[in-house]
């Protein structure tokens, strides 16, 4: 099974991707996580990608396509995966279809701009186990202590400020809305209300994928 999660920054793709991937025992591949891993390396590619991310701009198709192809052609993903954050535009979608021939399902997370901004600006994660929290909606039960592993160290995304987030949303709309129309005609496109809480969204996705 190959499932693509589409939606703007802060729509909840990463949270649901991890949950559903664990439930159906498939890898969760998040383009943003791949980029953040690359950025930590001392390479010219890392510097180039980091410059785009810091400015709230999308990384050029040629770079994105090559990075994602290198990952997806690994034998670790031969049985399927949940793909989060790719493709982002028509050119990427057609590149993806050029080397992936299996049937796919596309799930789009629909969320208002106002809620997206709060989700992104409030987002942080446990540095140890990567559990995601939000200063507006989902804080640890005990202050500064991770609910899952007990760690007291957290990561805050440096590229997340209101100006950059708003720009990322606008860039996303310009780039990705034509892709939504393209996939709507595929017969495998599904929309979920991303404004619901985590549990409700998870249930909606399980129904789409016909899993318990």
Curated annotation (Swiss-Prot):
Zn(2+) binds at residues 126, 129, 146, 149. It comes from the Bacteria. Its EC number is 2.7.4.3. ATP binds at residues 10-15, 123, 132-133, 196. This is Adenylate kinase. Pathway: Purine metabolism; AMP biosynthesis via salvage pathway; AMP from ADP: step 1/1. Keywords: ATP-binding, Cytoplasm, Kinase, Metal-binding, Nucleotide biosynthesis, Nucleotide-binding, Transferase, Zinc. Residues 122-160 are annotated as: LID. Consists of three domains, a large central CORE domain and two small peripheral domains, NMPbind and LID, which undergo movements during catalysis. The LID domain closes over the site of phosphoryl transfer upon ATP binding. Assembling and dissambling the active center during each catalytic cycle provides an effective means to prevent ATP hydrolysis. Some bacteria have evolved a zinc-coordinating structure that stabilizes the LID domain. Catalyzes the reversible transfer of the terminal phosphate group between ATP and AMP. Plays an important role in cellular energy homeostasis and in adenine nucleotide metabolism. CDD domains: ADK. Belongs to the adenylate kinase family. NCBIfam families: adk (TIGR01351), PRK00279.2-1 (NF001383). It is found in: Cytoplasm. AMP binds at residues 36, 57-59, 85-88, 92, 157, 168. It catalyses: AMP + ATP = 2 ADP. One of its GO terms (molecular function) is ATP binding.
